[in-house]
């Protein structure tokens, strides 16, 4: 039997994303030259939700993109040789813009490092900021998020699961013990 604890329900996730949207607007003094980019897979859906909230608050269209970091990961040798690049979908021009990278969970920092490499290969943003739904600690690289939905100190033997309605039927963040 797996011992699983719910950390955030649908309402808590909604509130966290609304707060992050307000923080992004405040920190950047609006949304001019702002691009929101989600890291595949769940980061994409979180980015889309953030854009919806920001557009509702500011009444301005905000470009949103998708970043596939498959071939930028430093653990690629552990992946199947059949790994297929799904492709990034970025706005035409990221050079000179403020890019908000969005991911579901920040853990070691390796996913974000790969995302930074992938993003910079597509242009030279003026600034890159990081927004995550959950920061669980245990960094292996000097990476710190600018916007956090929930700080969740964990043991390395725990797994944080983020489920989003777009891919998992329901919105929930839970933690479970690694077997």
From Swiss-Prot:
The keyword Cell wall biogenesis/degradation does not apply. Keywords: Glycosyltransferase, RNA-binding, Transcription, Transcription regulation, Transcription termination, Transferase. It catalyses: UMP + diphosphate = 5-phospho-alpha-D-ribose 1-diphosphate + uracil. One of its GO terms (molecular function) is uracil phosphoribosyltransferase activity. GO terms for biological process: DNA-templated transcription termination. Its EC number is 2.4.2.9. The keyword Cytoplasm does not apply. It comes from the Bacteria. A motif (PRPP-binding) lies at residues 99-111. Regulates transcriptional attenuation of the pyrimidine nucleotide (pyr) operon by binding in a uridine-dependent manner to specific sites on pyr mRNA. This disrupts an antiterminator hairpin in the RNA and favors formation of a downstream transcription terminator, leading to a reduced expression of downstream genes. Belongs to the purine/pyrimidine phosphoribosyltransferase family. PyrR subfamily. Homodimer and homohexamer; in equilibrium. This is Bifunctional protein PyrR.
